[in-house]
Each structure stands twice: as C-alpha cells, then as structure tokens.
Design a protein with these regions (language model features):
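Glycine-rich phosphate-binding loop of ATP-dependent small-molecule kinases
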Residues: 1-200
Length: 200
C-alpha cells in the first residue's frame, strides 16, 4: 500500500486497530502515523467525548460510564464506528482504542466483516506502573483522569483488553511494540514495522 489517498470506487477500507492501556501513547503515535503514512486516524475516546459535549441523544449514560471508568457498550461504539468508517474517503484507517474486549470483536465481526479488510492490530506495550505515572502527570482537564478512576481503567484494561492482545496474536496479525521507549524511538520502531509488514 502506497501513501496516495486516491482510492478506487468500491474499494474496501483497510483497518489497523491501535490498542494499548490508558496513557501508553496511542494518540501521539496515531498522529505521527497520519503524518508519515497518510492514514486517517479515529479515536473512539475523542468521538465519545465529543458526543457528550454536544449532548446528543443518550449522552448522559455515556458521560456517567466515562466518569466511572467503565467501558462503553459495544452497540454504542459500533454504531458510531460503522457510520464513520463507511463514509470515510481515505481507505487507510487507524482505529485508536478499539476493540477493548471480546464483545467488541464479536460486534465488529457481525457488522463490519464484509465491509472492510482488517490488516491487524498495533499493540503499544507499557507497564501498569508507567501508565499510571503518565496519566497522573498529564493535565488535559479530563474528568476520567483522577487517581481512583485511573486505577479502575487499568484494572479494566487488564481484565478486558489484555485477552484481545492474545486474540490478535493467535490470528498472527499482532504488531507488538515496546512502549517504554521515548516517543521518537517508538515512532521509529513503528515506522520500521509498517514498512516490514507492507502497511506504509
């Protein structure tokens, strides 16, 4: 796949999931991938926060779940994702922060399998202690970034999302990256993997 954004009519979107715990640096790396390889990046978290901010239908439930560090329902996420992906002109798409559990995968398979090509999952691996330190140290004014909620988010990640890493590993399309490195080193490792896997 080249860097051109020109696509053939009817071409299926190529999807690369980006997974990792809270504070692992997914957002920063997605921005760099967009700049270097001309992907379109979509963060489920950003879209959900926008949904709440715009006070769209059912936003109260989503807002409460986010404040409590709970996962948003698969049906809610899938509705938003499907609309976004199938209407996106750029067919090289990063999905940041999804799937988060087996239910997400099942919902995706049911609704998206025939419409897209999943190229794999990029997993940025960072220790829990480091993720907690990063989250407590950043100041983005997020309601879901206090110490108690961070603990819940990390717990949820261990329980729900770690098995997703194993799922993609079994599918032989997991790209595992050491997220304990500097931002620039991490970007370089990802770029090398993209070239190696034909994702550039």
């Amino acid at each position: 796949m080249g860097c051109s954004q020109e696509t053939r009519v009817g071409e299926k979107p190529n999807i690369l999931f980006v997974i990792g715990g809270p504070g692992c640096g997914k957002g920063t790396q997605c921005k760099r991938i967009v700049e270097k390889f001309h992907y379109k990046s979509f963060s489920t978290g950003d879209l959900l926060r926008k949904y709440v901010k715009d006070k769209k239908e059912g936003y109260e439930e989503i807002e409460n779940q986010m404040k409590e560090g709970k996962l948003i329902s698969s049906a809610t996420l899938m509705k938003v994702l499907k609309e976004y992906i199938l209407n996106e002109e750029n067919k090289k798409i990063l999905v940041d922060g999804y799937p988060r559990n087996q239910e997400n995968i099942d919902e995706w398979e049911k609704q998206m399998k025939d419409h897209v090509v999943v190229k794999g999952a990029l997993y940025i691996e960072v220790s829990n202690d480091e993720m907690k330190k990063r989250l407590l140290g950043r100041n983005e004014g997020r309601a879901d970034d206090n110490e108690e909620t961070i603990g819940k988010r990390l717990e949820t990640f261990e329980k729900e999302t770690k098995p997703i890493v194993e799922y993609f590993e079994r599918q032989k399309n997991l790209i595992r990256i050491d997220g304990m490195k500097t931002v620039d080193e991490l970007s370089e490792d990802i770029a090398n993997k993209f070239k190696e896997k034909g994702l550039a």
